[in-house]
A protein has these predicted regions:
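Surface-exposed interaction regions that form or flank ligand-binding interfaces
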Residues: 1-59, 66-71, 80-82, 91, ...
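Acidic/histidine-enriched active-site and ligand-binding environments that engage anionic O-linkages
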Residues: 85
């Protein structure tokens, strides 16, 4: 009886935490998308929530911004509090109200996204720019690297004196290639991706 109650309680807590994470993720993604739509003046198309197949399952990318000045692969983090970490650390730390929370290094997370996008094309590496954008009231307490920024730095970081790389025809090809390879946006695709993540976690567990 006790084990049944514990199981039910665990499921309820897990569901609630999952909903909270998804809600926070959606807020961050909306803020990034709205900022780009309002202030980024270069010719571009923004692809959101891009799920692509990989050799080991799937990867899900918050944003792929295809612009005439490059292909930006963007990971969004809607966090507040103090953020500690570094490019080479496997985990970073959020400190909020004296509570410490560990989370995966988003640079490493986004590197996998970047390599998946790069694999679709035969373009120079410098055409692809990874960015991690924090959209909450976070304060960086250590050097997180040049490609980790706050939302209010996004537009300046996107432009940053970059030369034009693609004409309209090339941009259309890049967008079409990603759209052709991505899985259809749906709840089923999201659940499929989550199941792949759970499977990888189980495989790593002793």
């Amino acid at each position: 009886m006790i084990s049944t109650i514990a199981l039910i309680a665990g499921l309820i807590i897990g569901f609630a935490l999952g909903r909270q994470i998804l809600f926070r993720k959606s807020i961050g993604e909306a803020l990034v998308a709205n900022t780009i739509a309002a202030h980024f003046k270069q010719p571009h198309t923004l692809l959101n929530n891009v799920t692509l197949p990989t050799d080991t399952g799937t990867t899900q990318i918050d944003h792929v911004l295809v612009a005439d000045i490059g292909i930006f692969v963007i990971e969004t983090k809607h966090y507040s509090g103090w953020i500690y970490g570094g490019p080479n650390q496997s985990q970073w730390t959020q400190v909020i109200y004296k509570v410490k929370n560990k989370f995966q290094n988003p640079i490493r997370q986004n590197y996998g996204h970047l390599k998946t996008i790069q694999s679709l094309f035969t373009l120079p590496d410098e055409n692809f720019i990874p960015l991690v954008v924090f959209t909450g009231n976070a304060e960086f307490k250590s050097d997180l690297g040049p490609n980790v920024i706050q939302l209010n730095q996004l537009i300046a970081q996107l432009t940053a004196g970059r030369p034009v790389l693609f004409d309209e025809r090339k941009m259309a090809y890049i967008i079409g290639r990603i759209e052709m390879k991505r899985l259809r946006r749906s709840l089923e695709t999201d659940e499929y991706h989550l199941n792949n993540i759970r499977s990888k976690i189980r495989q790593r567990s002793p």
